[in-house]
A protein has these predicted regions:
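Structural and coupling elements of P-loop NTPases
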Residues: 1-529
């Protein structure tokens, strides 16, 4: 069992939209032998669309909308370990932040992709905050070095300031843009030379940094600048130590170009070597160690309609400890029921295959026909455990959802229920007029919901404006005060889909006045309290 745990690497690739995250995922799959041709995501110039963007709407827009799970085996050159790599490719589009935050609860480490011309962007900052909260180790890949970009030292300073983490370069670019010659691999002390449009790294040369061979290969000026830069790197940044990376104090940095496969294999080789294998998972009752003999796992994502011919849901379960086995009975803790799974699956984006067993770190797809699962559910061999940390954040945009076809109200209801269980958005039912309000993190989610209701559930909806500032979950130890608050604010009170009380404030002023007037009421901005 320990051998199985040791060889697993479960991680997310995260970034701001268009920094090259899906492209990097595809290249990892290419090196892992999972796909023969990587589909460039950009506007589908290539007809083969990216493997990891598989919902119709994603293919149309060239952006990733929901987390894909992919896995492959990989043995680096010269290594005798076959690593089992589980990648979660997350949506970079800011409207899908909820899905991404949740994914970060199911991984042991993360790779952050940064565009070399743009540096750190808003989405990257938000996601890094979640990594910091959870002490998730990160590696940073600075992409698009074959385009004109910013000075590497400036980028490193910005990473340290904006992401609030110390960095340590493990590779260094030799020039950039049209003059880009390659990278010097500090971690392996090799020179990787760049030739555009090739499917593999062309020349890997073991060149001593002070030898004349270096001048011949990259030109005297470039060689002199490289020596100067590396001296500065060693002077400024502490020597790399794996333990400081694993404890999330230091982020190693690599440079390259994902589109041209450049610097990708170096990143992958170093990653599987240094990244942590599955780590302990915090439950409310105790910390669960991966090597415990009994199976435990939690649901971090639910996807409806992977197969449009069957209205079915798949619940994604992260195995936390023990060995998961097909057809074994497991306890669904929230419902107190025993369940067996006859066809658990593993994924390569849309292709899935049935498995007999899975180990800590693996992601297993469990068919969910009757809406059995909710996000955050725990499965065990009988122990009462509740895994923590799958919050919903307070949405920023709100609209009333109305039925546009009275003959299809049942389909609409089913569609809304399934999409909400999937965590696409949040549903609030106003207690005053009983109207349904959908709250999202971004505008695009409204389009996605409308599109999916029509295409997957054959139901039409329309949106109507509602002016709201924030939704906050409220609770109080003083029942009388809580009742008084609900009476006074009754037209602003709603229930979320779990039946919890939510106060819908229509302005920042109203919210701060409510907090002042009702001292014994706690206002929460995430559902995890």
């Amino acid at each position: 069992m320990n051998q199985e745990i040791e060889r697993r690497r479960t991680f997310a690739i995260i970034s701001h939209p268009d920094a090259g995250k899906t492209t990097l995922t595809e290249k990892f799959l290419l090196f892992g032998g999972q796909i023969q041709v990587a589909g460039a995501v950009k506007n589908n110039k290539i007809k083969k669309t990216a493997t990891s963007d598989w919902m119709d709407i994603e293919k149309q827009r060239g952006i990733s909308v929901s987390t894909s799970v992919m896995e492959f085996d990989y043995t680096p050159e010269g290594s005798d370990i076959e690593y089992k790599v589980n990648i979660l490719d997350t949506p970079g589009h800011q409207d899908f932040a909820e899905d991404t935050f949740r994914t970060l609860t199911a991984v042991d480490s993360a790779i952050i992709v940064v565009d070399g011309a743009k540096g750190v962007e808003t989405q990257t900052r938000k996601l890094m905050t979640v990594c910091r909260m959870r002490k998730t180790p990160v590696i940073i890949f600075i992409n698009k070095m074959d385009r004109e970009g910013r000075d590497p030292f400036d980028l490193l300073d910005e990473l340290e300031q904006e992401l609030e983490i110390k960095v340590r370069p493990l590779s260094w670019p030799i020039n950039q843009g049209a003059e880009f010659k390659g990278v010097y691999n500090i971690y392996e002390q090799k020179l990787d030379l760049f030739t555009p449009d090739k499917q593999r790294v062309t020349d890997k040369v073991e060149v001593n940094i002070n030898s004349e061979e270096l001048d011949k290969r990259v030109g005297e000026d470039n060689a002199a600048k490289l020596r100067e830069d590396l001296e500065l790197v060693d002077g400024v940044y502490p020597e790399f130590d794996v333990e400081t990376y694993r404890s999330a104090e230091v982020a190693p940095v690599f440079f390259g170009s994902a589109l041209n496969n450049f610097g990708v294999q170096e990143l992958l080789n170093c990653f599987v070597e240094i990244a942590p294998s599955p780590r302990p998972t915090k439950a409310e009752e105790r910390d669960v160690q991966p090597e415990e003999p009994k199976f435990t796992g939690f649901i971090f994502k639910i996807t409806a309609n992977i197969d449009p011919n069957h209205r079915s849901c798949i619940a994604f379960c992260k195995v936390c400890s023990g060995k998961f086995q097909r057809n074994q009975p497991y306890l669904h803790v929230r419902q107190g029921k025993s369940l067996r799974f006859s066809s658990p699956t593993q994924f390569m984006a849309q292709r899935k295959s049935t498995i007999d067993e899975a180990w800590p770190g693996d992601i297993v797809g469990l068919p969910d026909t009757g809406g059995v699962f909710k996000i955050g559910d725990t499965l065990t061999e009988g122990e009462q455990l509740h895994f923590r940390g799958l919050p919903s954040f307070s949405p920023e945009l709100f609209k009333y959802i109305e039925n546009d076809d009275p003959m299809k109200s049942k389909q609409l209801q089913k569609g809304i229920d399934q999409l909400m269980d999937e965590g696409v958005a949040q549903l609030f039912v106003n207690q005053f007029n009983n109207r349904k309000i959908i709250g999202t993190v971004g505008q695009l989610q409204f389009e996605v919901i409308q599109y999916r209701l029509e295409n997957e559930y054959n139901a039409k909806c329309r949106w109507e404006p509602v002016h709201l500032y924030k939704a906050c979950w409220i609770e109080s130890d003083d029942d009388a005060e809580l009742d008084n608050f609900k009476k006074r604010k009754y037209q602003y009170m709603a229930k979320d889909k779990e039946g919890r009380d939510v106060f819908l404030a229509d302005s920042g002023y109203v919210l701060s006045m409510a907090q002042e007037d009702f001292k014994h009421i706690k206002f929460h901005f995430t559902s995890e309290f």
